[in-house]
Amino acid sequence: MRLHHPLTLVLLLGGASAPAQDAMARLRAELERIHTLDQRDRQNVHGYAPGAQRDSVIAHMMHQDSVNRVRVTAIIDSAGWLGEAEVGRTANQALFLVLQHADARPDVQARYLEEMRLAVEQGRARAHELAMLEDRVEVNHGRPQIYGSQIGWTEGRPFVKPMIDEERVNERRAVVGLEPLERYTERFGFTWSPPVKQERVLRLGPGKP
């Protein structure tokens, strides 16, 4: 894996020609459009009650996700992980969002996770978004997540999907810039509670504060 790709390397060296600058501007505009499509479809889903119309919106969203995935992975392959300094926050975030929503292809998520890790090391991607993609990859491969960002639903009620070492999850979240899990889960209409330490229960005995 290369540290930099041809187009971004030219810009980093400060010798960007007019054609290179034009190419970057086009990529920025395209990624901003992809960002809009990704978020618009998800907002549209929330406007429908369960039924045929909602199913149709979801089907359209999944199709758009696949189109976005093909284009974004092609951009990363040819130009690298474009940082905010090159294309702005919205276009940069589009790279993450499209991979995060590529659940139909967990193999693609896992492959580009490595590219995003390198981008974080280079300051071209954000650590908290990497953490969310890491969780997505773990869950989609049937493994417990690390940061607790993935929420499931059972009988209409939300819950945090299984994760490693729950007692220290907020320590891990703080390292990558994520808010405490209790606050995060409030967005989904519930509040996660840290597990009670088993040794404390045994020491105090049942029914004691």
Predicted regions and their residues:
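A generic "functional-site adjacency" signal
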Residues: G14, S66, E166-E167
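N-terminal helix-rich structural modules
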Residues: Q21-G142
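Hydrophobic h-region of N-terminal signal peptides that target proteins for export
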Residues: V10-P19
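Bacterial N-terminal signal peptides that target proteins for export
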Residues: M1-L7
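Basic/polar N-terminal segments that are highly enriched at the extreme N-terminus
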Residues: P19-E32, P195-P209
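Mature-region segments of soluble proteins
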Residues: Q93-E199, L204-P206
